């Protein structure tokens, strides 16, 4: 939230997500709670399901347009496997709608058209998972006895091509701390 607010006032955050993924539902709920505490509105746009009960990919650009039309200042992209696989469609729709994106995973910024994200680098996640695997395979520990914890190192990544396309450049305060791609 501080990162988004560094760009300017945040009145409303839109969120497109796949409600079939528990992590996405929980993240959307947390953002809604944060909005209540921090004084910004949120609007969630769950992906419609097709006849097979899967997210309807064809509806993805429209969900983004609805977020923009509903007055969102930002589109928050939660951790979501469906959105990650379809990140180009999602981030292109947001860019084309003039809606800046804040992503929770680096692929949306590095490998697509997302604007900015405060992310746990995949490299760091891999190191931690390797440590856990060692504890299980070499140390003989049960997976259930290992603590679940969040990583405490994050990277601020800004996609400058997207910033240029949107005409929405990072504030000077980010120049010394962000990684620009």
Regions from the language model: what does each represent?
Residues 1-181:
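Short hydrophobic alpha-helices and adjacent helix-cap/hinge residues
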């Amino acid at each position: 939230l501080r990162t988004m607010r560094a760009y300017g006032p945040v009145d409303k955050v839109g969120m497109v997500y796949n409600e079939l993924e528990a992590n996405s539902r929980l993240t959307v709920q947390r953002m809604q709670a944060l909005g209540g505490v921090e004084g910004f509105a949120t609007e969630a746009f769950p992906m419609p399901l097709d006849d097979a009960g899967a997210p309807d990919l064809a509806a993805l650009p429209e969900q983004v347009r609805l977020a923009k039309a509903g007055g969102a200042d930002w589109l928050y992209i939660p951790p979501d496997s469906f959105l990650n696989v379809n990140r180009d469609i999602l981030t292109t729709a947001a860019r084309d709608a003039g809606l800046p994106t804040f992503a929770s995973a680096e692929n949306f910024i590095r490998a697509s058209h997302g604007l900015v994200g405060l992310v746990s680098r995949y490299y760091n996640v891999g190191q931690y998972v390797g440590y856990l695997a060692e504890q299980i395979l070499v140390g003989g520990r049960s997976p259930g006895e290992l603590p679940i914890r969040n990583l405490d190192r994050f990277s601020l990544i800004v996609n400058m091509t997207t910033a240029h396309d949107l005409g929405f450049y990072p504030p000077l305060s980010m120049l010394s701390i962000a990684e620009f791609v």
